[in-house]
A protein has these predicted regions:
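ATP-binding N-terminal substructure of ATP-dependent carboxylate-amine bond-forming enzymes
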Residues: 1-99, 106, 118-122
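Basic phosphate/pyrophosphate-binding loop/patch that engages nucleotide-derived ligands
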Residues: 103-111
Length: 122
């Protein structure tokens, strides 16, 4: 029986969407009794739980910071665990919209004009 960790929740403002997605994915995967599932959050015990469960795959359903910025990906790669999502470098670049735009422009990928908006502390 293959073990799969469903990584959901997290700290972004899209936390609830991540949890709803995790519930839906869990429901569907349970229909196929080939998998042993564990749903966890990226808390302080994440690596400990990961090592104990020894999954074949981590379904990364996190949004925003930690889930889409290369952070979780770097942990999973250091633990030699397969995961869904882009890799460390592509995630860390894509989360930065200005860098992404510059890469698109340099590679002649059509993209709408942009401007950088900086909030100054009052």
């Amino acid at each position: 029986m293959d073990k799969i960790i469903i990584l959901a929740g997290g700290y972004s403002n899209e936390r609830e969407i991540s949890l709803i997605t995790a519930a839906s994915v869990t429901k569907e995967l349970k229909k196929n009794k080939k998998y042993k599932l564990l749903t966890i959050e990226p808390d302080g015990d994440f690596v400990k739980k990961l090592r104990k469960f020894k999954p074949k795959l981590v379904l990364n359903l996190l949004h925003g910071r930690y889930g889409e910025d290369g952070y979780i990906q770097s942990i999973l790669e250091s633990e030699k665990v397969k995961y869904t999502h882009s890799g460390v470098l592509s995630s860390s670049l894509a989360i930065d919209k200005e860098i992404s735009k510059k890469i698109f422009i340099k590679n002649k990928i059509l993209t709408p004009p942009y401007f950088k908006f900086i909030l100054k502390k009052i």
